[in-house]
UniProtKB/Swiss-Prot annotation:
Its main location: membrane. The chain crosses the membrane at residues 194-214, 228-248, 250-270, 278-298, 312-332. The phosphoenolpyruvate-dependent sugar phosphotransferase system (sugar PTS), a major carbohydrate active transport system, catalyzes the phosphorylation of incoming sugar substrates concomitantly with their translocation across the cell membrane. The enzyme II complex composed of SrlA, SrlB and SrlE is involved in glucitol/sorbitol transport. Residues 3-195 form the PTS EIIB type-5 domain. The gene is srlE. Induction: Activated by sorbitol and repressed by glucose. This is PTS system glucitol/sorbitol-specific EIIB component. It is an enzyme of class 2 (transferase). It catalyses: D-sorbitol(out) + N(pros)-phospho-L-histidyl-[protein] = D-sorbitol 6-phosphate(in) + L-histidyl-[protein].
Length: 336
């Protein structure tokens, strides 16, 4: 009887990507989950039972990439969505998010699947071929003077002594290509990230104003957001280590509360000068869910991750109230 079994993962309602067929193997049998607050998603236990792999909480320790056969995230569409697909590690997102974030180009259907729940995971057929991230061995290549993937000017510049004219031409070409690619990336980021966010905020403001929720919430919010002391209390709540990692994913909480505060400032309920300390108060928890991923990108040792995650969480807790107080002092006299 085989030690490990292959599973098939399909996208859920509103999801993207897949289906993925994955199977652990000796030395590459770790299921890494990096979800808000280090909470274990319900699908982890099912995957472990079906495959025979071992699960590791990315908030508590790190795992060498060569030992990871599958990653589970709960990203709402930011950088974390594309980090592991970029490394060609099969990725499950429990949120219904598609090609989104600055690494969207790496999020493809053959390595990523989203909106995954218990019903989307099952044992794979014996004939199914699991994903294998193997490097293609390099074969000896015959040398040619010209190449189909390079311009004549590039080939001449590489294969012969470049003249001043060639150097100037190549330099100008690189500058133009760099600017052109920067423009393409900027437009792509606008389409995939900024415009959807603007639409989300517009919809949220419409719901708040149309439903009357804003008036009800304003009565609760004004005692906190309407003065500096209240904002420091709000910053204290958002910086509590047990809550900050849960409030961080996708910055959804900060977006909603920020929109509500912005609407109330526009209506005159909250003084405009409190916009600055309010910004610091509602963003104290930002990126607290990203700490293990960031340490992993820096190739931190497991011991470093174990110490680094609580260190950052507690450092945010210690500076949560002081940063709001400094912003409150700096906002005195604004818009007057």
């Amino acid at each position: 009887m085989e030690k490990y079994n292959a599973i098939k993962i399909v996208k859920g309602s509103g999801g993207f990507g897949g289906p993925l067929t994955v199977k652990p193997e000796e030395g590459k049998d770790t299921l890494l989950y990096i979800t808000g607050g280090g909470a274990e998603p319900e699908i982890v236990e099912k995957i472990v039972n079906l495959t025979g792999c071992k699960a590791v909480n990315g908030f508590k320790t790190s795992v060498p990439e060569e030992q990871i056969f599958l990653v589970i995230i709960d990203c709402g569409g930011t950088l974390r969505c594309g980090i592991y697909p970029q490394k060609r590690i099969p990725t499950i997102n429990v949120m219904p998010v598609g090609k989104s974030g600055p690494l969207a180009k790496f999020i493809t259907e053959d390595i990523y699947v989203s909106a995954v729940g218990l019903n989307q995971i099952s044992l794979a057929d014996s004939s199914a071929e699991p994903i294998k991230s193997t490097k293609v061995p390099e074969e000896g290549k015959r040398e040619f003077k010209y190449s189909a993937d390079k311009k004549v000017s590039q080939s001449l510049a590489e294969n012969s002594k470049s003249s001043i004219v060639q150097k100037i031409g190549m330099g100008a070409g690189k500058v133009v290509n760099t600017l052109y690619q920067a423009g393409r990336d900027a437009v792509q980021s606008m389409i995939t990230t900024i415009l959807p966010f603007m639409a989300f905020v517009a919809m949220l403001i419409g719901i708040i104003q149309g439903s009357g929720f804003g008036n009800w919430f304003a009565k609760i919010l004004v005692p906190l957001a309407g003065n500096g002391i209240g904002l420091m209390i709000l910053g204290f709540i958002c910086s509590i280590p047990l809550l900050s990692a849960l409030l961080g994913p996708g910055a959804v909480i900060a977006q909603i509360v920020g929109t509500l505060i912005g609407v109330e400032i526009g209506k005159g309920t909250i003084p405009p000068s409190l916009a600055l300390p309010a910004l610091f108060a509602i963003n104290t928890q930002c990126a607290c869910d990203f700490i293990p991923v960031g340490l992993g990108l820096a190739e931190a040792e497991p011991e470093t991750v174990e110490v680094g995650v609580p260190s950052v969480l507690y450092s945010r807790f210690m500076i949560g109230v002081p940063r709001v107080a400094v912003a409150w002092v700096a906002s005195i006299g604004l818009y007057q």
